[in-house]
Each structure stands twice: as C-alpha cells, then as structure tokens.
C-alpha cells in the first residue's frame, strides 16, 4: 500500500502525476508529496511529518 495515498482533507496522489493538495497525510513516500514543510530534508526511506515547522522533530 502506498502511504502517500492518504488524503484526509485533501488529495494525495503518488502515481504518474504526483500531487499533494491540502493533504493531512502523516507520511509520504520519499519526496513525492510535500508533506513536510519546504526546505525540510526528506528521510531516505520515506518521510514522517510530526509538525508544520522545519526542525529536528519534523521527520523521523
């Protein structure tokens, strides 16, 4: 299952055309969708967002 397709209050699509609009997903596959704030380093094996600010607690 693709963790990027988890639209809670928006649309997340990690298919051929990757889009992420108003998405409340908790995780995303690599850097496919901008679930983490802009400028926040994505984790190599995926990204788990823990907040809306870019700091050490953004991704784990």
Swiss-Prot record:
Purpose: Metallothioneins have a high content of cysteine residues that bind various heavy metals.
Chain sites annotated for binding a divalent metal cation 7: 49, 54, 58-59
Annotated region (Beta), positions in chain: 1-28
Pfam families in the record: Metallothio
Entry protein name: Metallothionein A
Keyword Metal-binding carried by entry: yes
Database matches in Gene3D superfamilies: Metallothionein Isoform II
GO molecular function: metal ion binding
PANTHER family for this protein: METALLOTHIONEIN, METALLOTHIONEIN-1X
Chain residues that bind a divalent metal cation 5: 33, 35-36, 49
Family of the protein in this entry: Belongs to the metallothionein superfamily. Type 1 family.
Residues engaged in binding a divalent metal cation 6: 36, 40, 43, 59
């Amino acid at each position: 299952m693709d963790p990027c397709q988890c639209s809670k209050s928006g649309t997340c699509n990690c298919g051929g055309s990757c889009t992420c609009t108003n998405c409340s997903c908790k995780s995303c596959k690599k850097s496919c969708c901008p679930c983490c704030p802009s400028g926040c380093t994505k984790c190599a094996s995926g990204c788990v967002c823990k907040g809306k600010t870019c700091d050490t607690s953004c991704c784990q």
